[in-house]
Amino acid sequence: MNKPVAIFLMGPTASGKTDLAIALRKQLPVEVISVDSALIYKEMDIGTAKPTAAELAQAPHRLIDILDPKESYSAMHFHADALHAMADITASGRIPLLVGGTMLYYKALLEGLSPLPSANEHIRTEIEAHANQYGWASLHQQLTQIDPLAASRINANDSQRINRALEVFYLTGKNLTELTAQQGECLPYQVLQFAIAPQERAVLHQRIEQRFHKMMELGFLTEVEKLYARGDLHPDLPAIRCVGYRQMWQHLAGEISLDEAIYKGICATRQLAKRQLTWLRGWRSEITWLDSLDPTSSQEKMIQNLEQNFIKL
């Protein structure tokens, strides 16, 4: 029996994924699933470039606005939620179209999840107590002894990832690198994978800067002010660590000026795009590349590839 079909539409931030997905929704029997670790949060619309109400009316997206900003979400959660959504879409006779730039989520779907333990509140509390006394740099040094490869990939100030890496070791006796090498069950779908980006990096950088300034015009600072005023959120939460939000939060905390926040937000977004492109260039599966500056041709290429490889549309 043939596996059902799924489509991945990947790419760096500001590359035009949402516009292309909406155009495809009008021509193909697809339903969109968001693959974005920021779009899952409610009350975070402008700074995440979340599709507007008008856009969602044309192409409803699953897995957006599902969590409060104080909650955490992981690749494990996404894996379960996405598989459920994909099965539901397939059962309705349509094709799952997964759209976004959180590459770790795509990897989790394609390769399955490594057998990592669930969070343990007691161990996390002990790790945090140690950090409060000696600092996260001390724990990062400890991680260097336990798991040099993981430590080299984790910033010494990244408390969330340091905590998780140490927690995994204390729970299992094995380091994160060892455990993540143990592959899980692969995705039970035939997947056609596309990536969209401008051919010139300078064009992407310009789009990122223009979009950030547009978000400011739309009221991004006011959006973050409302989150800041809630009183139950803090800068170590995954939601507030999202690019743009972290910098606006620093401004509201009096740490940097608004101009600095905007500049740093643009720089952080460009760094995010660079990491996303690095993921894509090292991707193990075959990808069909699309040009952000030629959306009509990109749409035609996707439809042509689908007809040739999987289905008659």
Swiss-Prot record:
What's a GO biological-process term for it?
Answer: tRNA modification
Residues at which substrate binds: 13-18
Q: State one molecular function term (GO).
A: ATP binding
Which UniProt keywords are present, listed alphabetically?
ATP-binding, Magnesium, Nucleotide-binding, Transferase, tRNA processing
Q: What is its EC number?
A: 2.5.1.75
Record bears the keyword Transferase: yes
Instruction: Please list the reactions this protein catalyses.
Output: adenosine(37) in tRNA + dimethylallyl diphosphate = N(6)-dimethylallyladenosine(37) in tRNA + diphosphate
Specify the superkingdom: Bacteria
Cofactor list: Mg(2+)
What Pfam families does the annotation carry? IPPT
SUPFAM superfamilies (UniProt xref): P-loop containing nucleoside triphosphate hydrolases (SSF52540)
InterPro entries associated with the record: Dimethylallyltransferase, IPT, P-loop_NTPase
Name the top EC class: transferase
Q: Which Gene3D superfamilies match?
A: 1.10.20.140, P-loop containing nucleotide triphosphate hydrolases
Q: Which residues bind ATP?
A: 11-18
Q: Where is this site: Interaction with substrate tRNA?
A: 102, 124
Q: Where is this region: Interaction with substrate tRNA?
A: 36-39, 160-164, 241-246
Name the NCBIfam families on file: miaA
What does the sequence similarity comment in the record state about its family? Belongs to the IPP transferase family.
The record's note on quaternary structure and interaction partners says: Monomer.
What does the function comment of this entry state?
Answer: Catalyzes the transfer of a dimethylallyl group onto the adenine at position 37 in tRNAs that read codons beginning with uridine, leading to the formation of N6-(dimethylallyl)adenosine (i(6)A).
Q: What is this protein called?
A: tRNA dimethylallyltransferase
Name its species.
Answer: Haemophilus ducreyi (strain 35000HP / ATCC 700724)
Gene it is expressed from: miaA
